[in-house]
Amino acid sequence: MPMPKKTSAAVFLDRDGTINEEVGYLDRLDKLRLLPGAGEAVRLINRSGMKVVVITNQSGIGRGLFDEVFVGAVHAEISRMLGEAGAVIDGFYFCPHHPTEGIGGYRRSCSCRKPAPGLLLRAASELAIDLSRSYMIGDMAKDVEAGQRAGAKGILVRTGYGKDMEAGSSAPDHIASDILDAVRWILGQGKTR
């Protein structure tokens, strides 16, 4: 009989406005800047034994502003930049769709565009993550909602769009000033719940 996979907790991170500066559509690598504390935050998660997974809507693909190869290049550059701080991302997951705008097969409703939980559920399956012991950090209500719909706790950060936002239909489990503040709160919870 096969042994069941051991699961671990994770911290899911929105990308734009949470890890890196919000610049509208990140369509050039020279626009990419990590937010202060992002490297330290990811490194702290790594040291805790939790996985770190980026979950991001990238409708710019569907709108024809850039392609999936470019998104891969952005993620490689984020990994390189975080690596300089001794931090590692365990996985990047993105949704290229938009329900009302876009080209070809990218223009459609889907289960992966936040606030739908599809990307978190896929990552949990592929990376053996226990969602009930996990967290989703983001700067928008849809990030919080996606995490909570997947069974994780949702944390709203006041960077990116979060500066001017309160939670929408899902009240966050915590509101933090930035990613580092959010991670310190998570680690203060005892890593798992």
Name these PLM-found stretches.
Residues P2-V53:
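Active-site neighborhood of HAD-like aspartate-dependent phosphohydrolases
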Residues I19-L35, I61-F70, E84-V88, H97, ...:
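Metal-dependent phosphoesterase signature
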Residues A38, V42-I78, A87-E101, G147:
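Substrate-recognition element of Asp-dependent hydrolases with the DxDx(T/V) motif
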Residues I78-G83, A124:
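Conserved hydrophobic residues forming the short capping helix/wall of the S-adenosyl-L-methionine
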Residues R108-V144:
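Conserved Lys-Pro-Asp/Glu-containing loop-to-beta segment of HAD-superfamily phosphomonoesterases
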Residues Y135-H174:
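Acidic, Mg2+-coordinating phosphoryl-transfer loop and its flanking beta/alpha structural elements
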Residues H174-D178, A182:
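Short acidic-hydrophobic, aromatic-tinged amphipathic segments that line or gate anion-handling sites
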